[in-house]
Amino acid sequence: MAAVAENAMSTTSSIFNERQINCTILGGARSEKKSVLNVAAILLNSGNSYLRLQNLENLTKCGFEKIVSVENDSKNFNLDDLLQNFPEVKFVIPLEKAADGDLINVAMAEIDSPCALVLRDSIHITQKILTAQLSENLAAQDVFCIVPRIFAQDKTAVPIKFVPGVKKSVLNIESDLQISNDEPTLYPFDFFGFYNTKKFKRLGGYDYSIKKPYWQNLDLAFRAWLWGERIKISTGLSLSYAEEIPLVDSTPDISQLRFFLKNMAPVVKDGRADLPLSKFLPFKARSSCGIFEAFRQFSSARNWVCENERRFSIDAFTLINDWGKI
């Protein structure tokens, strides 16, 4: 086998406790085809999609600068056949269980392109999924993430516009099917998006300590807004599911608590963020943790906020109250 295995490290920067993901990276030979897009493609694979080979073949004909195919299990596929059929594709094979965000971090570390389109093997990927003109237009907007329109198998629209609010002192996110081009949305549905890679890395990528995909996705998106970045909708970019839409598990758990401490609890004043000690008792009341574990989690988040105090532009209160004006 000509490909050489490499060890990969998460792109999560020093704003988190860095974590090395044990994985193998193979392939990625220089293609003789000229790339027409100054964009990389990241394909998240479930391992059981019947569209796998067709999607990879179509991606190689789209003109992407680089293609990174990310597996969710080391036993999901015939490696030798894929490397032979798609030598230009770089395959990331995790050797341990990792969340989607962790795997996207690894893929982002493997690309130098200014932008990356994150996809899944559960959607229809055509050779015209992203044209050169649309790619240039999206990249020129210089925002952290641009969210595509998404359609279900039956061609019905999937909600992609999410608006933050508060209900009974708890974050309440409402969805809306009515969308227009360039409208803001709180987060990208199912991680789908056209990402600015430099902004992604400056934000620190996904937090590996948040295990549940919904909260991991929401954490990075919320952080982007609080740190002065934007996420918006493009009606010119669209994706369609070829399989059932995955259920979204937003059940509050320890992942939600980590999200709360990093995003909802900090207060920004005079250009600095702080997680006040006065927030500990309310946090303890909602956490259902023992006093020592609750204090450990609170202290960890407080240290993180302190390290990044100057990165915050606004706090959650301002984001929610001024939504649509920012």
Give residue spans per PLM region.
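Active-site donor/metal-binding and catalytic loop motifs
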Residues: K232-P252
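A short, conserved alpha-helix in the catalytic core of glycosyltransferases
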Residues: Y187-Y195, K199-G204, I210-L237
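Short, flexible, basic/aromatic active-site loop/helix in glycosyltransferases
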Residues: P164-L186, D190
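Glycine-rich, basic loop-to-helix element that forms the pyrophosphate-binding segment
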Residues: P94-I111
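Non-catalytic, C-terminal membrane-associated alpha-helical segments of glycosyltransferases
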Residues: T251-F260, K269-I326
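Conserved donor NDP-sugar-binding/catalytic core segment of glycosyltransferases
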Residues: K128-F162
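Short beta-strand-to-loop acidic/aromatic patch adjacent to the donor-nucleotide binding site
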Residues: S113-T126
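N-proximal low-complexity "stem/linker" segments adjacent to membrane-targeting elements
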Residues: A2-E57
